[in-house]
Amino acid sequence: MFKINDNYLKLPGSYLFSTIAKKVNAYSEANPDKNIIRLGIGDVTQPLAPAIIDSLHKAVDEMGHAETFHGYAPDLGYEFLRNAIAKNDYQDRGADIKADEIFVSDGAKCDSGNIQEIFAQDNKIAVCDPVYPVYVDTNVMAGRAGTYDKATETWSDVIYMPCTAENNFAPDFPSEVPDIIYLCFPNNPTGSTITKDQLQGWVDYANKNGCVIIYDAAYEAYISEDNVAHTIYECEGARTCAIELKSFSKNAGFTGVRLGYTVIPKDLKCGDTQLHALWARRHGTKYNGAPYIVQRAGEAVYSEAGKAQLKEQVGYYMNNAKVIFNGLQDAGYTVSGGVNAPYIWLKTPDNMTSWEFFDHLLEDANVVGTPGSGFGPSGEGYFRLTAFGNYENTVEAIEQIKRM
C-alpha cells in the first residue's frame, strides 16, 4: 500500500493567510453590510505600468504568428531578460553577477520553498523570528525541522534568531552555528532592515563557519536609505556563501503575472560541487520556464519608461506607508517599519494577543491585518499592516482605527 509524506501531517493548522481568509469570509457572510478594508496579505492594487502592458501586447501578437511564436523557454530563462537583470540589478551596482548565474522562475515564493531541495536533510536551518512562514514550512515538509512544540510554537531542529524591539528587529548571530541561514531584508514582516555593514557581518560569519545564506531581497525596490545594500552581492565574499531570491511582484506589480529569479554564483560550492550546477539540474528537471510573454514584460521593467513608471508606483505605496505609520503613531501606537519597506509593524495595545487584536480590528474598524504571532513566537503581541492598498482605502482604514 502506498504511503504519504507524513512530514505534511506535522504542519500545525493551515497556512497563515488561508486562516485569515477563512476568518474574514466568515465575518463578511455574517455582516454583509460591512465594508472591509484589507491591509493584510501583501498583494498589490495598482495596475501594471503602461510600459509593461505595451510589452505584453507586443509579445502576445508575436505568439500569433509562426515566425515569432515561442514555445518552451530556455532552462535559465531568455537571455534578453537575464542580461537586463544582470546589468540593472547587479553590475550597475558594482556587484559581480553574470547573466548565466541567474535562473528565471515564476516567483520568489516558489524558489524560496524549492531551494532547500538541493541541501541534505540533516542540515540545520536558522531563521529570523518573526519570519515569512514559507521558509519554515517547506523545511518541515522536507523533514528538516524536527518536532513541533505547541507551547512555544517552535520546531526542535530550527534555530530561531529573535528580532525584537531590543535589537531593532535585526537578528544577532546565533550561538549555535547553522548550516543554512535565511535572511530577508528589507524584512517581511517587520519592515526593518540592516545596514550594508551589518550585512557584511553576516557574509563574514557565513564564510567563516561554512554556512550558506539564502537572501530574500523581494522588497529591495523600497529601500530609501543610502547605507542599505540593494543586493547581498555588494558585500565582499558574498559570491562564496550567498544565494539571492528576487521577485517582480512587489517592485512591478506582477502578483497576478508571476515572475522572479534566483541568483547562484558559480563560486558557491560545497566541497568541489557547485550549487549552481545542482540548482540547474533541479530547475531543468522540474520546471519548463516562465512564459515568453511574461519574460518580455519583465524586460520592460528595465526600460527607461518602465523604470520611471515603477519608481512612481513604489512612491505611491510608500506614501501609503507614511499615512499608516504617522496615523498610528498619532493614535498612540508603537510602530516601526515603513521606511525601507511597505510594511508597518505595530505593538498591540493593552497587552492584547496578536489574534485578539486581529478580531478587534476586524470587528470594530472593519480593517484586516496580519497577526504577528503567525510569523513566529517573537511576533506575539505585534501586528502587520501593508501599504499595498489604494490610497483612499488606506486613509479610511487609519481613520477607522483611530475611532476605535
For the regions a language model picked out, list residue spans one by one.
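N-terminal small-domain helix-loop-helix segment of the aminotransferase-like
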Residues: 2-106, 301-305
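Conserved core of the PLP fold type I
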Residues: 66-206, 220-235
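Conserved core segment of the aminotransferase class I/II
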Residues: 151-153, 234-315, 322-326
